[in-house]
Amino acid sequence: MAALLLAAAPALADESPVPGALQQFGLLGTWAIDCARAAGPGDEYSIYAVSPSGEATLTYTRGEAFRDIVYAIRTAEPVDNDRLELQVLHLPERIQVNLVLRKEGDSVRVWSSHTPDGRMLVIDGVITGNGKDSPRFKRCGGSFSAQD
């Protein structure tokens, strides 16, 4: 399924700015804290995908025992070569969250995140709720950059 979504992405990149920005940043596909382990509470996976109709989503999965967390990606704008700003809607509630992803070597992580009312969830890569670094995700089964 992911291969089909990735195959459709180049055609969609010219039609919609969101799929194009995700592809340019090298984000489309499956990422995990540890790709060698199955998704679970200690090894979350993030999946960036574009449907054939051009709808972009971000799905966090922690295994069968947990419900996936799905976001519709509404906007994707490059901040610089290493950062991409996303506006996402948590589904099905449609709660808006703004976030900035940051590339660090061969990984990507949430660098900042906030709600429209200004509530900060992640600041400079640190989760405000627990003071821990946001997890670093590595690409599963492929190169980091769309240009590689």
What are these regions (language model features)?
Residues 1-3:
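Sec-dependent signal peptide recognition
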Residues 88-94, 103-105:
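Intrinsically disordered, low-complexity terminal tails and linkers in eukaryotic proteins, enriched
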Residues 32-36, 57-62, 83-91, 111-112:
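Short beta-strand segments that buttress and anchor functional surface loops
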Residues 37-81, 133-134, 139, 144:
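N-terminal glycine/threonine-rich, aromatic-flanked beta-hairpin/loop signature
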Residues 46-50, 97-103:
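Broad, structure-driven detector of short, well-ordered beta-strand segments within folded domains
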Residues 114-148:
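Edge beta-strand at a domain terminus
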Residues 8-10:
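N-terminal signal peptide c-region/cleavage motif recognized by signal peptidases
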Residues 15-30:
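N-terminal helix-cap/turn-to-beta initiation motif at the start of protein domains
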